[in-house]
């Protein structure tokens, strides 16, 4: 069971990494803004650990200010002679993400993972709140039809029919195994008492549902052909005879080619930026809004990558500990670094060898299988404890 869980987790991490890589390749502004959060997080970790212990409010103000500075300074970097330092192709970005995953899984939690995830929380909440307000003010027209000709298969993004592809495509919004791994791995270590379980678990579910609604509105407000142009390959887009509408103008305003960047991150960022640009006196800031949204999404996903890779390291160490007890020691450097490296190599290899059309369905299926396993195990435990009536309300966050 542990080996199966590890295998499913590796596929899940590969699926997440593909989305970030497709959003950041050949994008100096986006790459600079997103990866600037790494040294910022390390600085905040050191600040709270040694420079000003316990001064969380100070660290929060400094960290958030530095993150916004990275976004604002991004276009200057993209237009400077140093732009080539932050411009990388797809494969290079994928390798960099695997290297980042290694350090996030091997370094102490307080140094990189915790401060980075903490700072990104403010960006996530603020961005989604601003998007909700923007939607209420702008009231964008939904352009995507409720039903397209592709529900029976043969679509430009995924070739399968709406059933069962809708469940494996939604991924975290459906039965989610990744959530169960984190909920039974890293989250319990951050709780001070059991009373925090309900507001965190149930609150996270409601928040994620709210985010899903905002994302759905933002992307369906795009013209369908523009949406497909972003999320499909060149070949499939041409084969269907589709034509772009607003996308060339949006690409010019953003300063990047937005065509054929599948994975969902770019289409969501374009949709969000399009809504924000419709606000009074905001039309000239579409480029900033787009890269701000890309940073929001990349931070959102990279928190999954670093936490998931660390959980994978824990699982692998525990598995190898059955053969060599030294691996059970979380302070044994060869075990920590070796297992972290192996996990990153495994999911990094999948990312390099596949594409979004292959990896995402694998990720979706694996994610649901892992969630099903957890659901069955947690329900069995409840019944073995003599609380059979509670088995009726067992959910994916159990």
Regions found by a protein language model. Give the residues of each.
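Hydrophobic transmembrane alpha-helices that form the core helical bundles
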Residues: 1-49, 59-84, 250, 260-276, ...
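Membrane-water interface regions at transmembrane-helix termini and the short interhelical loops
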Residues: 15-26, 39-58, 71-85, 99-119, ...
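Hydrophobic alpha-helical segments and their helix-loop junctions in multi-pass secondary transporters
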Residues: 45-49, 65-95, 103-105, 125-151, ...
């Amino acid at each position: 069971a542990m080996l199966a869980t590890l295998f499913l987790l590796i596929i899940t991490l590969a699926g997440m990494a593909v989305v970030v890589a497709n959003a950041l390749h050949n994008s100096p502004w986006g790459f600079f803004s997103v990866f600037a959060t790494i040294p910022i997080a390390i600085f905040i970790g050191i600040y709270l650990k040694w420079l000003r212990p316990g001064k969380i409010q100070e660290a929060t103000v400094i960290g958030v200010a530095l993150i916004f500075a990275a976004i604002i300074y991004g276009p200057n970097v993209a237009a400077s002679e140093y732009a080539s330092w932050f411009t990388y192709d797809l494969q290079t970005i994928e390798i960099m993400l695997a290297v980042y995953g290694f350090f996030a899984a091997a370094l102490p939690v307080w140094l990189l993972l915790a401060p980075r995830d903490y700072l990104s929380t403010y960006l996530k909440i603020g961005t989604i709140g601003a998007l909700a307000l923007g939607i209420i003010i702008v009231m964008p027209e939904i352009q995507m039809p409720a039903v397209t000709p592709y529900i029976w298969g043969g679509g430009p993004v995924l070739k399968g029919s709406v059933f069962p592809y809708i469940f494996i495509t939604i991924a975290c919004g459906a039965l989610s195994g990744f959530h169960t791994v984190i909920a039974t791995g890293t989250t319990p270590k951050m709780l001070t008492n059991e009373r925090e379980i309900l507001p965190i678990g149930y609150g996270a579910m409601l928040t994620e549902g709210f985010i899903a609604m905002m994302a759905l509105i933002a992307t369906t407000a795009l013209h369908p052909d523009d949406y497909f142009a972003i999320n499909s390959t060149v070949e499939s887009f041409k084969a269907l005879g589709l034509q772009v509408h607003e996308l060339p103008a949006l690409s010019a305003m953003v300063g990047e080619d937005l065509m054929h960047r599948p994975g969902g991150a770019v289409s969501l960022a374009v949709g969000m930026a399009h809504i924000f640009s419709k606000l009074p006196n905001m039309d000239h800031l579409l480029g900033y809004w787009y890269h701000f949204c890309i940073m929001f999404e990349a931070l959102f996903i990279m928190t999954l990558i670093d936490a998931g890779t660390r959980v994978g390291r824990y699982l692998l160490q525990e598995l190898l500990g059955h053969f060599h007890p030294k691996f059970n020691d979380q302070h044994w450097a060869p075990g920590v670094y070796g297992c972290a490296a192996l996990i990153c190599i495994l999911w990094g290899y999948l990312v390099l060898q596949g594409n979004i059309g292959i990896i995402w369905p694998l990720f979706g299926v694996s994610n649901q299988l892992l969630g099903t396993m957890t659901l069955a195990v947690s329900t069995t435990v409840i019944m073995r404890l003599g609380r059979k009536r509670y088995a009726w309300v067992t959910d994916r966050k159990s």
